[in-house]
């Protein structure tokens, strides 16, 4: 008899629970009976990985120069930093991807708020890649065919875009955000966080690929693999640009990715970061998701080294900078996006 009563009570409780849920007591539609139940209709299935990006798990690492760079270490000592999870493009932005950006702006100028008041020539004058960098950046270097063909010819579609300054990279991130979220909103999906340039700390953390001690993105300390092949696109020696297989830039996935699945975190082209330049930035910023923003500092951080740099600039801890308005044949960028959700590297089940 007791078992029957307990069974009947359980059935009654379950029936009442479903009835209350149907009435909206626990966030469903209908009345909430004056109870605090939250707002209904806010289902969230997790954040999808944007196309062309990889998710970088949260973690802690020691940010700073390698042991063989004692001069830089005296200015900005190594520091333990924690980085939250984020997404990052697995390759540098290519010529063809940047071309889509230019085409979309030209075809729909009125659709983007960030173009309001910029003037009719803003796209071509400020955003279109500066192809003259292939001639202007190098003394007495004239008649280079890349001036004519690098951005325009389909043979270079999968090569990293160059001749783009920090400001243009920022506008690209604004457009990419609007382009994605306009589509998602029109299809009843929640909007994604903004695309942006990675912070310098995020960039270095991602470049290390989860390794505790990594002189280069592949680990190190050597720049060749066991078969003698170069592991990145850079300048191996004076006047020697071709030992790595490419005299200039290389297609964005020509070399092995690091352990996070990121290509060309060393070499090919240097990459704009969000941060303003300060020689002692690592020492003075906070130790959790740091970004050094100084609106009065026109110099912006560039990381990774390029096809025209020696191996020192390929090291994960080596820092560099360019003026935010400068365009070069050796600087490009990739985008990042904040991950919304649990930041840990291992998700709870």
State what each model feature region is:
Residues 45-146, 160-168, 267:
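A short glycine-rich, aromatic-capped structural motif
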Residues 41-43, 73-77, 319-324:
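Short, P/G- and charge-enriched loop/turn segments at secondary-structure junctions
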Residues 23-52, 119-124, 130, 340-349:
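Sec-dependent signal peptide cleavage junction
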Residues 1-36:
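Bacterial Sec-dependent N-terminal signal peptides
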Residues 24, 29-34, 55-56, 62, ...:
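Functional-site microenvironments in short loops/helix caps that host divalent-cation chemistry
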């Amino acid at each position: 008899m007791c078992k029957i009563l307990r069974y009947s009570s359980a059935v009654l409780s379950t029936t009442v629970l479903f009835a209350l849920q149907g009435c909206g007591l626990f966030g469903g539609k209908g009345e909430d009976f004056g109870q605090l139940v939250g707002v209904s209709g806010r289902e969230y299935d997790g954040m999808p990985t944007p196309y062309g990006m990889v998710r970088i798990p949260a973690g802690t690492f020691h940010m700073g120069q390698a042991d063989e760079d004692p001069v830089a270490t005296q200015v900005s000592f190594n520091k333990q930093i924690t980085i939250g999870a984020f997404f990052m493009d697995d390759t540098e932005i290519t010529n063809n991807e940047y071309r889509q950006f230019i085409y979309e702006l030209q075809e729909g100028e009125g659709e983007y708020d960030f173009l309001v008041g910029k003037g009719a020539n803003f796209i071509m004058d400020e955003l279109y890649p500066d192809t003259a960098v292939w001639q202007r950046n190098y003394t007495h270097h004239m008649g280079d065919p890349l001036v004519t063909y690098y951005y325009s010819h389909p043979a270079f579609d999968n090569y990293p875009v160059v001749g783009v300054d920090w400001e243009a990279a920022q506008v690209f991130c604004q457009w990419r955000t609007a382009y994605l979220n306009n589509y998602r909103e029109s299809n009843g999906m929640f909007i994604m966080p903004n695309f942006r340039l990675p912070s310098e700390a995020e960039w270095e953390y991602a470049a290390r690929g989860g390794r505790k001690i990594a002189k280069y993105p592949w680990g190190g300390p050597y720049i060749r693999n066991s078969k003698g092949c170069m592991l990145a696109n850079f300048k191996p020696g004076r006047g020697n640009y071709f030992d790595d297989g490419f005299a200039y830039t290389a297609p964005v996935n020509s070399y092995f990715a690091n352990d996070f699945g990121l290509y060309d975190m060393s070499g090919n082209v240097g990459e704009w970061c969000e941060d303003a330049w300060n020689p002692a930035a690592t020492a003075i910023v906070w130790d959790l998701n740091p970004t050094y923003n100084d609106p009065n500092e026109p110099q912006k951080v560039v990381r990774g080294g390029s096809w025209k740099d020696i191996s020192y600039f390929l090291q994960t801890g080596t820092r560099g900078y360019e003026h935010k308005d400068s365009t070069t044949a050796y600087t490009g960028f990739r985008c990042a996006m904040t991950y919304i959700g649990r930041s840990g590297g291992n998700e709870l089940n």
